[in-house]
Amino acid sequence: MNYSRVPEFEKDVKALKKRVQSLEGDLERAKHLIEALYGRHEAEQAEFKKLFLAGKKATILTKTGAVEVVKMRLDTDTDSYRGKLRLVFAVAVDKAEVSFIELYSKNDKPREDQRRLRRYDA
């Protein structure tokens, strides 16, 4: 899968990296999880995705055509931010491309930026 970051996401990472020292490693682990969700064969992927989304770990925000926008809890090694970071990304399933759209802490804001999602959805 190909990964890209939108400019606003880079700003989010820069701001949070000051408080969350393990952030880059946490994002790398998230990439492996995304690979498991979307990089498998269709039959394996459907069952794994169903089980993963059934928990409180992630949810599909929007689905238009072959693009899914997903919000996922980002697991971190930094104690004070454990369970509080959220990663929003768009997956173009047919192209095997993932765009990281937003990274935020629940301490800073309660929800994702809807305007940013509309800008990058599709």
Residue ranges of model-derived segments:
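Arg/Lys-rich, positively charged N-terminal/basic patches that mediate binding to nucleic acids
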Residues: 1-40
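A broad, low-specificity signal marking well-ordered, structured residues that form hydrophobic/aromatic
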Residues: 3, 70, 98
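Short amphipathic alpha-helical surface micro-motifs
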Residues: 16, 50-56, 82-86
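Short linear functional motifs in flexible/disordered or boundary regions
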Residues: 21, 25, 39-42, 46, ...
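Residue-level signal for alpha-helical context at structural boundaries
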Residues: 27-34, 45-48, 106
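Charged, low-complexity, helix/coiled-coil-prone segments
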Residues: 28, 56-71, 104-117
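A short, surface-exposed loop/turn module that caps and links secondary-structure elements
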Residues: 37-78
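Enriched for short, Lys/Arg-rich terminal
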Residues: 74-122
